[in-house]
Amino acid sequence: MIEKETQILQLLSYETSMQKKRAALDLLADADDIAFLIHPLAYRSSWEFCAKALFFIEDARLEPHLPELLAWVEALNDEGSELVEFRLQDMQASMLLAPLETFILQHRDSDSLDWYFGVSRLAANGLIYPRLSRETHAVLQQAEQKVK
């Protein structure tokens, strides 16, 4: 991780003032890559504000990182996961469809249902659900039955 990215993550910590968080957003405006904002394991104290920063990043910049963002949504108890889910709900359905379908199919044989709780609202989107494959519908229905 480069020095500027480390500085941004440190400034986004819940322990820093809002003024410092604003400074982090200013630095972020010039960042070439945003991958360092996505669930940075070494900066747990920054997760919530990293997720909030993602609200200001356009869909096209988020699109290459959708698998990692969906994994964050799956981590239900992690700070920021619900915020990331809200951000993805606002994303263009055409961008979200393929990565979401891949994510769901990867969890077809999972014993844990955390993935389902994390992405079920995304999959239920009226623009996405009808476009999912039969196989993906079956996986979602099977998970829903396990929940009941």
What residues fall within each predicted segment?
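Amphipathic alpha-helical scaffolding segments comprising HEAT/armadillo-like alpha-solenoid repeats
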Residues: 1-10, 30-41, 59-72, 93-105, ...
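Eukaryotic acidic, Ser/Thr-rich intrinsically disordered low-complexity regions
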Residues: 2-6, 112-148
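Structural detector for internal amphipathic alpha-helices that build alpha-solenoid repeat scaffolds
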Residues: 10, 18-30, 48-60, 71, ...
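Short coil turns that connect the paired helices of HEAT/ARM alpha-solenoid repeats
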Residues: 11-16, 40-47, 74-79, 106-111, ...
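Short, intrinsically disordered/low-complexity patches at protein termini
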Residues: 104-107, 120-122
